[in-house]
Amino acid sequence: MAKLLAVFLVLLIAALVCEQALACTPGSRKYDGCNWCTCSSGGAWICTLKYCPPSSGGGLTFA
């Protein structure tokens, strides 16, 4: 039982660290060449869903 709890805690901590690494600064905006993205008050990207024709270049990368 103790090992199961330890594994659960490790997974929980890993998930929280990953979530924080992907968070953005609330109010910040980015343009990917077609759509605008705004960072919500909760730290998540919200983007317009305008159709974007295929292009040779990449787009905005959230990493």
Swiss-Prot record:
User: Hey, where's the site called Reactive bond on this chain?
Assistant: L49, K50
- Where the protein is mainly located, per its record? secreted
**Keyword S-adenosyl-L-methionine included in the entry's annotation:** no
Going by the entry's taxonomy, the superkingdom of the source organism is recorded as Eukaryota
Which keywords appear in this protein's UniProt record, sorted alphabetically? Disulfide bond, Protease inhibitor, Repeat, Secreted, Serine protease inhibitor, Signal
Q: List the disulfide bonds.
A: C24-C39, C34-C52, C37-C47
Identify the residues that the record assigns to the Pacifastin domain, covering every copy.
24-55
Q: Name one GO molecular function term.
A: serine-type endopeptidase inhibitor activity
Expression by tissue: Expressed in hemolymph, ovaries, testes and fat body of adults but are absent in the gut. Also present in larval hemolymph and fat body.
Q: Which residue ranges traverse the bilayer?
A: none
Where's it found, cell-wise?
Secreted
Signal peptide stretch: 1-23
This protein's GO cellular component annotations are: extracellular region
The similarity annotation says: Belongs to the protease inhibitor I19 family.
Q: What does this protein do?
A: In vitro, active against alpha-chymotrypsin.
Q: What is this protein called?
A: Serine protease inhibitor 3
| UniProt source species | Schistocerca gregaria (Desert locust)
